[in-house]
Regions:
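Extended, folded domain segments that form the structural surfaces/walls around functional sites
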Residues: 32, 74-76, 84
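Short beta->alpha connector loops at strand-helix junctions that form conserved
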Residues: 78, 104
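N-terminal flexible/basic segments that precede or flank functional cores
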Residues: 1-49, 53
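Short alpha-helical DNA-recognition segment
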Residues: 56-76
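DNA major-groove recognition helix of helix-turn-helix/homeodomain DNA-binding modules
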Residues: 85-103
Length: 105
């Protein structure tokens, strides 16, 4: 019995997607945060991570400086385990050049 030759399985190398690499303009950054606020308004940790993504896109060192925080404090506050105070969120938003706004539900 003759065996049919088989092709070796090709392995595809993947890399994790990092949204911060794709946030290039202030408009893209604002739209990204707005999407989080619109789609997951009760997900405080997700919104904090979104702020962290934008901060990484802009440069954590500069954002921390502009927010009056240490770089380490900024990373910690905006990490998945972080729980930033509202004051910190406001400082970071100002440093990022984005505004949080309210509208009637």
């Amino acid at each position: 019995m003759r065996k049919t030759p088989t092709k070796k399985a090709m392995k595809t190398k993947t890399t994790p997607y990092d949204v911060a690499e794709h946030l290039r303009t202030p408009e893209e950054m604002a739209a990204y945060l707005d999407a989080w606020l619109e789609e997951a308004p009760d997900d405080a940790a997700g919104i904090a991570r979104a702020l962290g993504d934008i901060a990484r896109a802009k440069g954590m060192t500069q954002v921390a400086k502009d927010a009056g925080l240490s770089r380490e404090s900024l990373y910690r506050a905006l990490s998945a385990e972080g729980n930033p105070s509202f004051a910190t969120v406001l400082k970071v938003a100002r440093a990022l050049g984005v505004k949080l706004h309210a509208e009637a539900a």
